[in-house]
Amino acid sequence: MIRTFAWLLPVLLSIASASAQQDRDNIKIRFTAQTRPADLGELVMVTEDRRSQAFNLPVNHLTEPQTAPGRLFRLEAERQALPLAQVRLPETGDDFVVLLVSGDDSPYEAVVIPYRGDGFRPGDYYLHNVSSLPVLGSVGATEFVIAPRSGRVVRPSGARDERFYDVLLGVREGNASRAISQSRWPVASHTRTYVFFFDDPVRRDVGFRAVDEFVPEEDP
């Protein structure tokens, strides 16, 4: 029995190692950023023993799927070897979106969202608040409040004529609230939208901007 176990142990370890390697090779990430310096250059994902292909970081769309070197890695500027963010992926799942928002203790903070699943569907909005004030509002009949440095999925309802939503965005200052935008957003059944709220130094107010992601019909 002992001899059998001694022979079997290396085989099991080899299988486990191969499985872990396959897991790492199968993890895909799409990136976008709230903002980026003009001279940032290409980025790489780095672990102790692996390094990804370099890629450009967009701010108006998502990257093509990038192969992650593991579930825990550093994001660096390739040209300067400058650490930008630490990224920790969930233990399960192999397809993610990573939003890079302005960090407190590092240039970026990574916000990880599963790419597939019922939690974030076509037609939904993911709102992330990097500003110093709570953000509140409504998309159609769906209301929301988002604390600073947090985010949530908003599933809109109550479209007008099935074509657009009345959208009201505002901030809370102390016990009072005030509007920062009133507009209409179109109903988009094949698009998911990421909305960043941030402190705008030019306007000296909370600003926001959106990144749309087209989701093909075969994707959930």
Where in the sequence are the language-model features?
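Positively charged n-region of N-terminal signal peptides that target proteins for export
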Residues: 1-4
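Bacterial N-terminal signal peptides
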Residues: 6-15
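Intrinsically disordered, low-complexity polar regions and short flexible loop motifs
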Residues: 20-220
